UniProtKB/Swiss-Prot annotation:
One of its GO terms (molecular function) is microtubule binding. GO terms for biological process: actin filament polymerization; chemotaxis to cAMP; vesicle organization. Transmembrane segments: none annotated. Keywords: Coiled coil, Repeat, SH3 domain. Residues 126-155, 162-184 have a biased composition (Basic and acidic residues). It comes from Dictyostelium discoideum (Social amoeba). SUPFAM superfamilies: BAR/IMD domain-like, SH3-domain. Residues 126-184, 301-405 are annotated as: Disordered. This is SH3 and F-BAR domain-containing protein DDB_G0271676. Residues 318-327, 340-360, 372-385, 392-405 have a biased composition (Low complexity).
Amino acid sequence: MSAQRQFSEDLWDKFESVVKKVDNGKIFTQQLSKFLSKQQQIESAYAKSLVKLCKDKSFAPEVEMGTLRDSFQCYREQLELIGALHEEFSNRLEKLVTIGIDGYLEESRKQRKALIANGEKCTKDLKTAESNESKAKQNYEKLKRKQEEANEDLSKQPPGAKEQKARKTLESATKAADKGDNEYRESVKCLQQNQQKFYHEEMPRILDDLQRFEVERIDKSKDWLMEVITQNELVPPAVIIHNENIKKGIESIDRERDLQNYILVTMSGAQKPPEAQYEPYQSGGGFAIVNSSSNSNLNISRKSGELNGGGSIQNGASIISSPQQPQYQNIDHQTPPQPNIIIQQHQQSNNNNNTNNNSNVMTTPPPPQPQPQQQQLPQPTQLNNPPQPPISLSKNDSSNSINSNSNGEIVRALYDYNATEENEISFKANALIKVVLRDESGWWQGMVIGESDRIGVFPSNFISDSSDSSKKRVDVAGRKCKVLYDYRTDCEGELNIKEGEILTIEYEDEGWFFGSNESNVSARFPSNYVQVI
């Protein structure tokens, strides 16, 4: 292996070229910083656009149902997580640029400037000494030639006045030549000193320092680029995991199940109307006038008689009764109990199916899995649903209101519910329920899809009401909120909060706020546990 060449040994006379190399290295490092900053901005914009797209409610699969809807919702959720991965990579890239590259440029600026300034001074001193030595030598040689000329002129003069004059001229020329000689010697000595500094002492050290400076810059550039690739390599494996989750969601699409559920939810259950029959004209006396071609087997009763189809004849006219409309139970509204009162199970009044004024009287429906002696609701079983805050009931003096849903709105259960009365229905979390009646008391009527056609009552606070999804969300990004209740969780990505604490909100997501506390710890927390201030 050949010996390594050095700036001080092989570029001793190329200081200006070395300075240009160092300056070009600085320019390259600045370009690298700008390039990676631009890459970071693109990554951040892509990540934010991806997350914004996934959060856009206009693309929510509300018009679809069943496994296809769930699969597309899974796709949106996993794509949002992929966007979060790119945002995390963007943040690391920004940190690398600001702390790593830009920090190095600022730190090395003074050191680089000092080395170049010392080298330029050393070069200038050498050139000045060389110039002075050259001028002193020329002056010395000129004076020596005058001394020789004066000595030669003296040798040609005869004794007398001219000889005396020539001798004085020679003496003057000799003194000037001696002075020039001394100046020349001093200039040579000064040049030797500067040559020692330039060729053997100061300049070699400067060149070695500049070489080490370049070595460090190149090594750091290599490390920076390697760090970018290393961080970038962390994204694809995580993306593959999210893509696998998307594939599982797509594979779970069940066409027959979706279509059968649609049929079950949409069908009215009514019988097809009977085939149209010819009805002969009834005379004023109540007797039918029958043509000879009419069906002779048609039974006609007079006045108070009955038709075979079940309709009654009054005053000679046939009246066919219409299908009986479904009768819904009337639920009376009752003021809910105060927060400090232990929540009791609803009570059912006496049922009397033979009277028109019969109704079931119920209290406010129970909260999901209530805990006696406490006002804290349990955590929901679904990850995307925020927990309920401690129960706070207020008196509602409004009159009872009953709304019948003729279209059969479909809602999804948030929690398991076990019926405690005969007229109630039981269901599991995520079950689909077809609502046939709403009531302000909180008890609705409906049927569990896919289990039975039985209609019963159930508490409305155990289900997700799709009518609330149309409410516009208030932009709370950047605002402060005050914690109303303590919230403790072991779930990764959720924030423990304490009553009275002040939090900063970054964005809202389906009943959750994402933000940070005063210790700059960022995570999500239930929006119904805080009050925006």
